[in-house]
Amino acid sequence: MIEVTLLGTGSPVPDARRAGPSTLVRAGGHAFLVDCGRGVQLRMAAAGIAANGLSALLLTHLHSDHIADLGDLLITRWVTTFTDQVPLQIIGPPGTAETVTAMLAAFGRDIGYRIAHHPDLTAPPPVEVHEVTEGVAWDHDGVTVRVAPTDHRPVAPTIGFRVEHADASVVLAGDTVPCATLDALAAGAGALVHTAIRKDLVELAPQQRVREVCEYHSSVEEAAETAERAGVGILVLTHYLPPIAPGQEADWRARAATAFPRQIELGDDLHRVEVHPGVCVKPAG
């Protein structure tokens, strides 16, 4: 079984009820944080996972809302680890290493203060960055993480992840429009976690910059169509824009159900979904 927790279901627009985009995936004794949006560590604490309990950080792309708390995560993991400092594995698209280096540099004075003050902190936060666009990015203890390109242009490159364990599988799409590479990555998966925006509402915004968001994100219906093409068993919607207003969950769900007739999950931060083997309707390949 793979457990998915929607830590942050929000967007770049601050929302008192929703943290920034971030999802926790637990599989085979490992914990993966997918993206680290605004407020993620508060939601991690509520979900019972500490920064030093993560096996790896998976970044779908380098938009600010998906990496807003990267620096906080790196520093917190470092100062709350009281055993050997094992490097945090960070898997992301090309550009990730530069971003991580710049983030640590931004905290350079803080890191220096702490090393000077605490004798057991002798080096900056240890990280190992793996830049990938496709293929197997992680394979340990029966847990495999596969990567494939997505389409969030002009943001490029962007990637999605597929986590597999004991015949269960979950795909995390990140921000993307429908594309063949995501269809292939999601084929036969137990669940697809997908960003969803209400284009019918966003297109009404008076500001062109807001309307342009529709150009490189999937609508609720498009996310559902991707899930149906892939034959997944469960569609998990997240990263809602605009935020789902209280009482409007049924409307969002109904829009997805026009294209996807099976289990549809959406909700507030900390919504949890269990993905068991055998829930897909179309075997991979």
From Swiss-Prot:
InterPro entries: AtsA-like_MBL-fold, Metallo-B-lactamas, RibonucZ/Hydroxyglut_hydro, RNase_Z/BN. Keywords: Endonuclease, Hydrolase, Metal-binding, Nuclease, tRNA processing, Zinc. The keyword Phosphoprotein does not apply. Its EC number is 3.1.26.11. It catalyses: Endonucleolytic cleavage of RNA, removing extra 3' nucleotides from tRNA precursor, generating 3' termini of tRNAs. A 3'-hydroxy group is left at the tRNA terminus and a 5'-phosphoryl group is left at the trailer molecule. The active site is at D65. Zn(2+) 1 binds at H61, H63, H152, D175. Binds 2 Zn(2+) ions. GO terms for molecular function: 3'-tRNA processing endoribonuclease activity; metal ion binding. Its cofactor is Zn(2+). Transmembrane segments: none annotated. It holds the Pfam family Lactamase_B_2. It comes from the Bacteria. Zn(2+) 2 binds at D65, H66, D175, H239. Belongs to the RNase Z family. Zinc phosphodiesterase, which displays some tRNA 3'-processing endonuclease activity. Probably involved in tRNA maturation, by removing a 3'-trailer from precursor tRNA. PANTHER family: ZINC PHOSPHODIESTERASE ELAC PROTEIN 1 (PTHR46018:SF2). Homodimer. HAMAP family: RNase_Z_BN. This is Ribonuclease Z. The gene is rnz.
